[in-house]
């Protein structure tokens, strides 16, 4: 059974492809999940993709990652990035390598979007690469864990 990376998406990411496509692009959440599965399989890994608009669900997903022995977490906390100390604390508590991802460049947007609580609990943060940031995050996690791409 392959080792698993959790890919967690927060509020409004279920609307990717239709919500502000000039900011977030036309790719859908299904496209993100497919990209993540393809990227992970190239490293002999599996992904468990989950999305919720509710902070408590995201915290439960993070706890589930530890309970199931996941080796990494890729998280796009959406708007909770800028507000949720609880998500930060959950990521810090489980002690699983995590990468924060944002489709848009949060540092080039409104001032209230330029601070991230969750990034402080991740070993890396990627923003502005569109959905390709998820591919980069999985590749970065694999590198951090010493996992090389399969031929």
Curated annotation (Swiss-Prot):
GO terms for biological process: amino acid biosynthetic process; aromatic amino acid family biosynthetic process; chorismate biosynthetic process; quinate catabolic process. SUPFAM superfamilies: Type II 3-dehydroquinate dehydratase. Its EC number is 4.2.1.10. It comes from the Bacteria. The gene is aroQ. InterPro entries: DHquinase_II, DHquinase_II_CS, DHquinase_II_sf. It comes from Rhodopseudomonas palustris (strain BisA53). The keyword Lyase applies. It holds the Pfam family DHquinase_II. The keyword ATP-binding does not apply. NCBIfam families: aroQ, PRK05395.1-2, PRK05395.1-3, PRK05395.1-4. The active site is at residues 24, 102. Homododecamer. This is 3-dehydroquinate dehydratase. Belongs to the type-II 3-dehydroquinase family. PANTHER family: CATABOLIC 3-DEHYDROQUINASE (PTHR21272:SF3). Pathway: Metabolic intermediate biosynthesis; chorismate biosynthesis; chorismate from D-erythrose 4-phosphate and phosphoenolpyruvate: step 3/7.
